[in-house]
Amino acid sequence: AQMRKIGNRLYGCDTCQIVCPVNRGKDWTHHEELAPDPETVKPLLVPLLQMSNREFKERFGASAAAWRGKKPIQRNAVIALGHFREASAVPALIRVLMDDPRPVLRGTAAWALGRIGGAEAERALREALAGEPDPEAAERIRAALEALGSSESSESGFQEV
């Protein structure tokens, strides 16, 4: 359920500004200096997955995303790719699944691959499951494989993980 609620947001600060009662009715469009940088607030998602700590600090250091840190932003990028069912992201998600040292990111990549589907994703999930040392990440991989299996008989292809 958490994955569904995040949707395609990388961080929630923009949403808070939109719904804040203090900001209701304010028109910030005439203050160019307050306009968000599109590259910062809506970055390309796949490059975020390979971003180093230094690159993250350089790119997001002056934004509200910086206080969240790289890991949550990368996790949320993986979730967004899963929600978009972005097939072109499968190779990058497989790299996260196979190579990332963080079990949370490996498990989240498994979830995204389960949402996107395809033979390449399924092969990678099966291979990853055989060598996954973390029990929670392994459970996410199993759930993703189950979602892929149920997608053949389900119209939506979606099983909440």
What are these regions (language model features)?
Residues 1-12, 66-68, 99:
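Ferredoxin-like iron-sulfur electron-transfer modules
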Residues 1-4, 23-53:
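Non-heme iron-sulfur electron-transfer modules
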Residues 9-11, 15-33, 92:
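Iron-sulfur cluster-binding cysteine motifs and their immediate structural context
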Residues 38-75:
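Glycine-rich phosphate/pyrophosphate-binding loop
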Residues 55-60, 86-98, 118-130, 151-161:
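Amphipathic alpha-helical scaffolding segments comprising HEAT/armadillo-like alpha-solenoid repeats
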Residues 67, 71-72, 87, 101-104, ...:
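Alpha-helix N-cap/helix-start positions at coil->helix boundaries
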Residues 74-86, 95, 106-118, 138-151:
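Structural detector for internal amphipathic alpha-helices that build alpha-solenoid repeat scaffolds
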Residues 103, 108, 123, 127, ...:
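Long C-terminal interaction/binding lobes of large macromolecular proteins
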